[in-house]
Each structure stands twice: as structure tokens, then as C-alpha cells.
Regions:
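The conserved phosphate-sensing helix
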Residues: 21, 30-46, 78-82
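Winged-helix-like regulatory helical subdomains adjacent to P-loop NTPase cores
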Residues: 49-122, 137-138, 142, 150, ...
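An amphipathic alpha-helix signature
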Residues: 6-14, 71, 113, 145
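Conserved small helical "lid"/interfacial subdomain of P-loop NTPases
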Residues: 1-25, 31, 42
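Extended amphipathic alpha-helical scaffold segments
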Residues: 96-97, 111, 132, 149-408
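A short, conserved structural fragment
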Residues: 122-135
Length: 408
């Protein structure tokens, strides 16, 4: 039976269990990986407990659903076989003709490629993996793969997670990032989170000493595991920058508005409220980053699927920071950035885009909800625009904003 799509899982939950809360359906879709029965089990647990916490760590569901199946086939075997299954699950797909980057795994297990291939054939006989053209190996069931990754690299540490991450980050970055993300979203117990954090930090410390270029890339992917250290690193980097002179009025905003690009790691950091301080300090030194910072604000700090749940806390923090830094219109660069951002934040409907599983993209249509939080941040925007309108140089920008607002 082919796995269900995310939309099919969502429909299953709505029609059979009457679960309509998008936060619950999103988490259940993530953990079920297209397995309808697993989705129903998770849905029933969520209904019974009435809390999101009940389905943050689904180790129990996985254990009850896959435990006997795997114990009877491989988990009661030797570590070589279990380790091989874990390696395939970590990578999701392996081509036997391109095994060079995985030699370190075989060394960890103390086996050669022939023994690995013998294990693959046994796993195929046990319906754990599929083999295509006698060459390409793929885990048969994504949820089984998730279970094996946790068992091999976190619970039993047959191969340490840090060994996999450290050796594969350059050559198989996507597999590394997706696997770590899966562990922290599907098995989000304090114990698993701490074990994963510890392993990631081992690689962090090693790269910080050994390879500065690779370390920057690693921090970009895994800053959430050490947010304070990341902010300190970025703050030191910003302090060391010389700054520049740039005429912000020369930016062709209309032409660049829809050409979204946010590649700078300083602009990408999202740990509030400290990140706002860094973002604005960086902009003060490099006003030529105007469009990239504008796009970072509209992509990461505008309304998303969680804004209503959080009563628009992020938007209140953002506008408050703008109010501090525009200096009643005396800071021209900051004032102009605020006006451009305000045009986005004053919309009544929002269409954010989010990265989904396995290189997919999720599109949302989110209407503004009238709450104390939404009224607060919007009132703050209008008050600040009124202050800026007292300055002749901003009137044309604000009048254009009002025309755009009236056309919604």
C-alpha cells in the first residue's frame, strides 16, 4: 500500500476523528510519515490526552506499532546487522556503487563491504529494505526508518550520532539535517533532546577548532542547539565589520520587492528578541543589505500559522524594536525600512511559505484574527506612521502605503 500524502492524512484525521486543529494535524502528519494506521493511533492519543505534548514524543506509539515486528526480525540479532539497518535508515537511500563516503560506518561496525551487502540481503528478506536493480537500497517504511535511527544512533549508540553528523555533514548535508530534524520533532522527549544536543555539540566543538569555514556552515544549520553562543559569535562578527556608506534612497524597491533572497547567515538568525538587536545593528552598518533584511522580516517575522496562537508576540516585539531605533524619524535608514515592513504587516491576509518534508513546500492562506495582540501591534504601527508623516521626506512613502492598504 502506497503511503498516504500529507493531505490524505489530514483528511483522514478530519473525517474520522474530527481533528481540525492545524497544529495537531501538522504534528500527526509529521510523525506518521504517510502511515494511516499510525496517524489514527496518534490522533486517538491526542484526543484522549487533549494536549499537544502527548504527541510530541511518540516513542510509545512507535514501540507498540513496530516493536514486535523489529524485535522478531533484527533487533534480537547482532549489532552489525542492526547497525547496517540504521545506516540505511539514516541515509534513506544508498547506492552500493557509491559507498565510499560510508566506509567510516563500516569501520565503526568492524565489517567490510561484503558483510554489509550480506546484511542488506538479509534485511531485504525480512522486508526492512527494498533493493532496486541490485544496486540501490531504500528503507521500506519511513516510520520503521525513524525507529531504527533512534534505536541505533541515540538509544544504543551502536554508532554515535556525532560520528555520523561529523563525517557526513559535507558530503550528505541534506540527510544529516533531515535526520536530526526528525529526531527532535518526532521523538521530542527531554532524554532524546539532550542526547541529540550533546552529540551535535561534540561536532560543533570539533569544527570550531578545526575548520572555520565549515564551522560557519554548521552553525547556520544547527544554531538552535546553542542559540546563546550563536548570538555571541554573530555579535562579535558584526562588531568586527567596518561598516559602509550607502544611499538607501537609491534602492529600487518596486523592482526588487518580489525577488526574495535571504542568504546571509546573520540575517537568517531567528532567536527573538536578541536576534532583532543583531539584525538592526547589522543593518545600521550595512544599509546596502536593505532588501535582504526586508525579506528576512517579511519571511520570518511576519504573520505565520502560529501567530494567532502566540497572540502576535513576534510582531509586537518587532514593531517595538523599530520604534526604539527610528528615533522619531531621525534615523532615515531605519525609518524607511519600517515603512516598507509596515506595508506587509498591515495586510489582512497573509500567504507564508514553509519548507515541508523531503524537499516539499507548504503554502498557507492565513487571515488576520482580531485579538488583543493583533490590535496592539497594528496600533503601534499606525502611531509610528503618524509620527513619521510629520517629516516631509516620508510623506510620499506613507501615502503610497495608504493607497496599497485601501486596495486590500
Amino acid at each position: 500500500v502506497a503511503p498516504f500524502s500529507d493531505e490524505q492524512i489530514k483528511a483522514l484525521l478530519e473525517q474520522n476523528l474530527e481533528i481540525f486543529n492545524h497544529i495537531f494535524t501538522r504534528q500527526i502528519t509529521r510523525i506518521s510519515e504517510g502511515n494511516a494506521r499510525l496517524a489514527v493511533l496518534a490522533g486517538k492519543l491526542a484526543l484522549d490526552k487533549r494536549t499537544l505534548e502527548s504527541i510530541r514524543d511518540v516513542s510509545g506509539i512507535y514501540e507498540s506499532y513496530y516493536g514486535d515486528f523489529l524485535n522478531g526480525r533484527i533487533l534480537n540479532q547482532n549489532n552489525n546487522l542492526i547497525g547496517c539497518a540504521g545506516i540505511i535508515a539514516f541515509m534513506n537511500v544508498i547506492n552500493l556503487s557509491e559507498m565510499g563516503s560510508l566506509d567510516f560506518c563500516l569501520e565503526e561496525l568492524g565489517i567490510d563491504r561484503k558483510r554489509f551487502e550480506d546484511c542488506v540481503r538479509y534485511l531485504h528478506d525480512q522486508e526492512i529494505v527494498d533493493i532496486y536493480h541490485n544496486q540501490v537500497i531504500k528503507i521500506s517504511d519511513q516510520c520503521v526508518g525513524n525507529y531504527l535511527v533512534k534505536h541505533v544512533f541515540v538509544d544504543e549508540q551502536i554508532i554515535p550520532l556525532s560520528t555520523m553528523v561529523g563525517n557526513l555533514f559535507v558530503t550528505r548535508k541534506t540527510a544529516v539535517v533531515e535526520t536530526v530534524s526528525m529526531l527532535t520533532h518526532v521523538f521530542a522527549s527531554p532524554d532524546v533532546m539532550e542526547k541529540v544536543r550533546r552529540e551535535i555539540c561534540l561536532v560543533w566543538d570539533e569544527l570550531q577548532q578545526a575548520d572555520k569555514t565549515l564551522f560557519r556552515e554548521f552553525v547556520k544549520m544547527f544554531y538552535a542547539f546553542r542559540p546563546v553562543e550563536t548570538l555571541i559569535l554573530l555579535n562579535d562578527e558584526i562588531d568586527s565589520l567596518p561598516g559602509e556608506e550607502f544611499d538607501i534612497d537609491e534602492v529600487d524597491f518596486a523592482q526588487k520587492r518580489n525577488h526574495i533572497s535571504v542568504n546571509d547567515e546573520i540575517v537568517n538568525i531567528r532567536e527573538l528578541p536578541e536576534a532583532l538587536d543583531l539584525l538592526f545593528e547589522y543593518y545600521a552598518k550595512y544599509p546596502s543589505k536593505f532588501m535582504e533584511i526586508y525579506h528576512a522580516i517579511t519571511r520570518y517575522l511576519s504573520i505565520d500559522k502560529d501567530s494567532h496562537t502566540n497572540d502576535y508576540w513576534t510582531q509586537i516585539q518587532l514593531v517595538s524594536k523599530f520604534q526604539q531605533d527610528i528615533e522619531n524619524g531621525l534615523n532615515h535608514n531605519m525609518s524607511l525600512l519600517f515603512i516598507r515592513a509596515a506595508s506587509e504587516l498591515l495586510k489582512l491576509e497573509f500567504s507564508p511559505v514553509e519548507a515541508g518534508k523531503h524537499n516539499t513546500v507548504i503554502f498557507y492562506d492565513i487571515p488576520l484574527v482580531v485579538t488583543e495582540g493583533s490590535k496592539t501591534y497594528r496600533s503601534m504601527i499606525w502611531e509610528t506612521l503618524q509620527t513619521l508623516y510629520n517629516h516631509e521626506r516620508y510623506r510620499s512613502y506613507i501615502e503610497a502605503l495608504l493607497v496599497e492598504y485601501s486596495n486590500q
